[in-house]
Amino acid sequence: MIKFNIFFNGQLFVSNELNFFIQTNQSKILFVFHGLYGRARNWQSMAKKLSLDGSIIVISVDLRNHGENLFDEDHSYSLMMEDIIKLFNYLNIKKTNLLGHSMGGKLAMLLSLTYPEFVNKLIIADIAPIDYQDDEGEIINSLLDLDLNLIQSRNDADKILSIKIVDKSLRMFLLQNLQLVNGRYEWGVNLKVIKKSMNNLKSFPILNEVKKNNQEALCIYGANSKYVTNTNLVSFKKYFANISFKKIEGAGHWLHVEKPELFFETISIFLNN
């Protein structure tokens, strides 16, 4: 079963204590899907804050080949959708809200378009429903080239990665996946499978005959991001008839980390409106 964390009243629940509440308050549930190289834990502080007043239950999910999930030999949006639908069925979710960042944002959009009956409101964080041509190869090759047998600490890894990955904040984010297991460092993300699946992850694999979605949707994006721009904003209208946009000044792709207060305020207003 896919790994997930439940936050309510600012607290983390790891059992079925909230099952009854989940069944009777589904319009107040928000599922959060992280981006590539991310994990549910990255969203812990935001999830706690969103759930603090008791009006929202936040369920943050480790997507396949990331975080605490078991590694699998395949990775695609269709498989991730299957994982999430299985989770919905396990929790007896009939209708819910979705928030996805980057890869998780594409997953949330695809779920909303493919299984609209499950989705109440949709929040997309800094990704567009398009095929991206950007070459992510340098990042994943740098991680795969790192000889973990020579690594004694995260600082060692950071020094080596800094030769090819100049952005320190990006390195710090990536190195969150480096974990010490039985005295040896290992990656907490299935890099080989991710590399093999990169073409699928850069695409937006939706069927042409999909119906335009009328659900209430919000795209929140960083003014300094290369992923959502004035040029590709029009792509959302092809799929989402009822979408609004919020640009966060001074933020890039990791807008929820760079401008957490404004990000929190924006999605809180949207969910509670």
Features from the language model and the residues they span:
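Alpha/beta-hydrolase fold catalytic core
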Residues: 1-31, 52-56, 93-94, 271-273
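Conserved HGGG/HGGXW glycine-rich cap/lid loop of the alpha/beta-hydrolase fold
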Residues: 25-70
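Gly/Ala-rich beta-loop-alpha elbow adjacent to hydrolase catalytic centers
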Residues: 100, 104, 108
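Flexible "cap/lid" loop of the alpha/beta hydrolase fold
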Residues: 110-113, 120-151
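Conserved alpha/beta-hydrolase catalytic His-Asp/Glu region
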Residues: 134, 149-203
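Conserved serine/cysteine hydrolase catalytic core
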Residues: 183-239, 244-247
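Catalytic histidine-centered segment of alpha/beta-hydrolase-like enzymes
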Residues: 251-260
